[in-house]
């Protein structure tokens, strides 16, 4: 059942499903009483949101209620959160709202149940486990690039990142301001060409380590061959830098580092190749939650990107199999089958603007940035929404931009 009407309505949609479940008494009362806390506060918030939910969900009220009943009555149900067609305005709120939905229906701590956040890379879960996505101030690519562009950060050490492509506007502003740019990468990327120092890294077939996938399965990576030419594994590059800095090193092999991880992260302790963390746990929370009971946290996110006068479209990025092309563009075969650059536009909007399918248009932001791209009619975006493949130069960090679309004048 397709429910999402437009970007920014994810949390409202989930709250609408919870509202139906509570109103019709479909919640798992035993599970809520024994394994959660905060149900009273959640009910109060959902009741207070009634006008907002009704206004936003009026067009597909029946479908939302149907989906809520199906989800509740399912023996096993899982929520998958991906980048999808719509960009996430508040990813944390979406995750919390999804957890609320899973908890009130008892779809947590059981086989084939729960909430899974689908991340981009094969080892993204491993990066999360190591604390790479901390919420502390000073973390995050956009934050660091912003500080560098303001000349509040004078040195950048980039590993496997190419902000000139993934964040072209902010990336160039930042890289032109730093006094020292170090790039560690497999390729001589656009960003690497601007670097003061380039550290050549080898590929995954030449290094040892582990991958942790979404099901928390830790898999060992065995090198197929030695690093080519003067390249080194990321681990060996870090070791070389630590030695130059005369920093005390506790472990000089991947095995020693993995043992250290196990000492600091108890759920990694004793894990062998192919096992899931924590050891002996095919799914999480079967025996209970870390703090005893799971907390239901009310969230009330909504459409925060209003369309200013004269800019009637929401421009969002749609996921692309080839992403920025950092790896895929190195293959002639992949380049032949790669996605062509075009804007997806609802046919109703195209006809209103008198823009033909396959016609090139100009897309502009309020601050004067623009691009020209061919239009492709599609029923996927609703009227008022257009999509461009990731990465789009008008959008930074997978957000949403308000834009206007104009026919090109023929002189």
Residue ranges and their predicted role:
Residues 82, 288, 299, 316-319, ...:
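Structured loops at beta-to-helix junctions and adjacent beta-edge loops in soluble globular domains
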């Amino acid at each position: 059942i397709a429910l999402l009407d437009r970007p920014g309505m994810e949390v409202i949609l989930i709250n609408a499903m919870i509202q139906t479940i509570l109103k019709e008494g479909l919640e798992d009362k035993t599970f809520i009483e024994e394994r959660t806390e905060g149900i009273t506060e959640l009910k109060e918030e959902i009741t207070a949101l009634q006008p907002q939910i009704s206004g936003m969900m009026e067009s597909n009220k029946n479908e939302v209620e149907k989906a809520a009943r199906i989800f509740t009555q399912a023996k096993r149900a899982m929520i998958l959160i991906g980048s999808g067609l719509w960009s996430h305005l508040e990813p944390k709120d979406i995750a919390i709202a999804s957890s609320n939905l899973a908890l009130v229906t008892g779809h947590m701590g059981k086989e084939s149940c729960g909430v899974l956040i689908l991340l981009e890379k094969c080892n993204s879960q491993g990066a999360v486990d190591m604390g790479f996505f901390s919420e502390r101030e000073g973390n995050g690519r956009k934050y660091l690039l912003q500080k560098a562009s303001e000349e509040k950060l004078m040195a950048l050490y980039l590993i496997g990142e190419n902000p000139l492509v993934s964040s072209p506007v902010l990336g160039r502003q930042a890289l032109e301001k730093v006094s020292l740019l170090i790039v560690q990468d497999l390729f001589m990327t656009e960003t690497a060409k601007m670097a003061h120092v380039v550290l050549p890294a080898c590929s995954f077939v030449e290094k040892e380590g582990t991958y942790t996938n979404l099901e928390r399965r830790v898999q060992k990576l065995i090198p197929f061959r030695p690093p080519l030419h003067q390249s080194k594994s990321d681990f060996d590059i870090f070791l070389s830098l630590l030695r130059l800095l005369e920093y005390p090193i506790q472990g000089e092999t991947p095995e020693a580092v993995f043992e250290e991880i196990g000492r600091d992260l108890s759920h990694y302790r004793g894990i062998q190749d192919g096992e899931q963390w924590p050891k002996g746990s095919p799914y999480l929370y079967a025996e209970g939650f870390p703090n005893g009971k799971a907390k239901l946290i009310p969230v009330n996110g909504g459409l925060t990107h209003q369309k200013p006068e004269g800019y009637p479209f929401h421009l969002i990025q749609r996921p692309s199999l080839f992403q920025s092309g950092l790896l895929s563009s190195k293959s002639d075969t992949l380049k032949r089958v790669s996605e062509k650059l075009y804007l997806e536009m609802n046919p109703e909007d195209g006809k209103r603007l008198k823009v033909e399918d396959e016609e090139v248009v100009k897309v502009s932001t309020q601050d004067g940035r623009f691009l020209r791209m061919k239009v492709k009619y599609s029923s996927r975006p609703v009227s008022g929404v257009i999509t461009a493949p990731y990465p789009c130069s008008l959008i930074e960090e997978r957000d949403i931009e308000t834009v206007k679309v104009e026919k090109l004048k023929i002189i």
